[in-house]
Design a protein with these regions (language model features):
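Acidic/negatively charged segments and metal-coordination signatures
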Residues: 145-167
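Nucleotidyltransferase catalytic core that binds NTPs
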Residues: 1-147
Length: 167
């Protein structure tokens, strides 16, 4: 899917479990970099390995992502149970996007997709989104489990006061 076609293809990836406003902002800003936005969605096997559980099943996450304005396609990863490769290298090699966007706390030194992006000629872009990492699925789930205890973002506030509109 290189740019010798008419359209510049942008890809993003993540578990998105659950989807939150930071993800939506990342998608909006990523879409501005090209014509087509593909979201590579890490499957339930990947989430189970990374977090030890799945909060929202992959088919529900996929349906939500497909409903977000600006998202043109959602591709589910093919990670097997208990994967050793936690990257989206296979999906990037298959899709061959022009740009691979990373949000939040990702940077060149901590993403495993650098080599495949170099190989396929895909530009990597970091820190996409409005205001950096504004929310985290892990923060949301941790606060829920802890009954809205101290916000894990380090603000010193209770989670509801820090990140909820009517907290």
């Amino acid at each position: 899917m290189k740019s010798d076609r008419k359209h510049v293809v942008v890809a993003v990836s993540g578990g998105f479990d659950p989807v939150h406003v930071g993800h939506v902002r990342m998608f909006q800003n990523a879409k501005k970099l090209g014509d087509k936005l593909i979201v590579i969605l890490n499957n339930d096997n990947w989430l189970s390995k990374k977090k030890g559980f799945v909060f929202m099943p992959q088919h529900e996450r996929k349906e939500l992502l497909e409903s977000i304005a600006g998202v043109d396609k959602v591709v589910l990863t093919r990670h097997q149970a208990n994967p050793t490769d936690m990257s989206v290298n296979a999906e990037l090699a298959h899709l061959k996007p022009d740009i691979f966007v990373n949000g939040g706390d990702r940077k060149l030194g901590n993403v495993p997709e650098v080599a495949v992006c170099n190989q396929i000629g895909c530009k990597m872009v970091f820190n996409i989104g409005k205001g950096g990492k504004v929310q985290s699925s892990s923060w949301l789930l941790k606060a829920y489990v802890q009954n809205a205890a101290d916000c894990p973002c380090g603000s010193g506030k209770k989670f509801k006061k820090c990140h909820m509109a009517h907290g």
